[in-house]
Amino acid sequence: MTLAHIAEVCGGTYFGPEEKKTAEVTDIVTDSRKAGEGSLFVAIPGERVDGHKFIPNVASQGALAVISEQKLETPPCPYILVKDSMEAIKAMAEYYMQQLNIPVVGITGSVGKTSTKETIASVLAQKYRVLKTDANFNNELGLSLTVFRLREEDEMAVLEMGIDDFGQMHRLAKIARPETAVITNIGWCHLENLKTRDGILQAKTEIFDHLRENGHIIINGDDDKLSTVGTVHGIKPVHFGLDEKNEYYADEIESQGFRGISCRIHTPQGSFSALIPIPGRHMVYNALAGTAVGCMYGLTLEQIKQGIETLQSVSGRFHIIETGKYTVVDDCYNANPVSMKASLDVLKEAKGRKVAVLGDMGELGTDEAALHAEVGTHAGTCGIDALYCAGPLCEHLAKAAKEADSKLEVRHFADRESLMAELPKLLQDGDQILVKASHFMEYGKIVEMLETAQKL
């Protein structure tokens, strides 16, 4: 897009040499460190850092222009003055997506968005050139920046969309314009704003209002809330799950320990067996979602199987690390009651001393104490050997675990730092260690400590 075109799309005013108005931007960035020749830098006033202070830096790095909410007295490069930088970014992303018009698979749900996104992208990549959401770029800014990474040669986009309030999905889906909507499940996340699972269902299904003509809806048919979804805007949902009533279902499910989980997948086109190389029963659901999407877009069952079996784990998302001293399951990117219990169920399949290192789960609303206790009860009955946890809410978790199994070794610490100070003394060589907590607990620091244990 040219600077003149961008100014028009985002409703801004261009300031700079007339001849620069027809210059094409090479990329759009909000991180000043990534700005280079031909970049358009969007200055966003953040809570901690105001992007406007970096305008001189990006100009010296060769940026073509900047978008600013502030009038610049001595602009170091051409700029476009706007009322709201975030609104400008979203307007540009929405326009850019419309121009490309490539098929988009939009993924949402309470649990498993990222692992489902990775699975679907791995499947589709067996036939198409696929761009997928990086890391956790699933909010309005992250989605917009992902859209800007699309190029004409890309054949499909797999975009993750995360929300925590009503109306957010409308804004995300307006940008993404999905052709296919995939909803993984309706759990107990973001209850502070959405209040109930019915509220979560309402917020997630806002995505349906933005599906393209002749779109697809793919949902978890085993989920009691999603199973109530009927035909929407003339689109009949397709279901996946473990119940054979679903169009896509799985049986013969067997844990292969930390090697993964095997199953047989049934589709309207036939059946096949697969070894999913990431542990956990929840991964079967991800494979089923990937299978359904793959069939929608013309992949053979052999291509789908290949995509599933070559799937790779992502750091912080059940990523297995062999340190030489321990086996560490890095699942600390985020946590909620459903995913916490699922991860504990995988840990119990491990060979060796099974240790859960857990932390507080956030955004659970008024039921937070009860939900932590529920996870604690599960920890006390699922067959692990030790539970070490930290955080004020985990006090409820630890107490419930001990009540469920008085013989279970349980230690609770006030905070992560206290836990980290004692953890090396509590662990034994050969331990199989699950590390999981909500992102704000920063349990990645525990993983880093365990990774370096062999080098001490």
Features from the language model and the residues they span:
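Active-site beta-alpha connecting loops in nucleotide-dependent enzymes
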Residues: 48, 314, 332, 336-405, ...
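Phosphate-binding loop of NTP-binding sites
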Residues: 7-8, 88-216, 225-233, 425, ...
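N-terminal leader/targeting and accessory segments in enzymes
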Residues: 1-91, 377-378, 382-392, 407
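Residue-level signal for inorganic ion chemistry
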Residues: 6, 39, 58, 92, ...
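Mobile, glycine- and charge-enriched loop segments
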Residues: 34-43, 130, 148-156, 344-365
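ATP-dependent carboxylate/acyl-activation modules
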Residues: 107, 315-317, 440-446
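Acidic, Mg2+-coordinating active-site environments of NTP-dependent enzymes
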Residues: 9-13, 68, 72-76, 182-328, ...
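Peripheral docking tails and interdomain loops at the edges
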Residues: 430-451
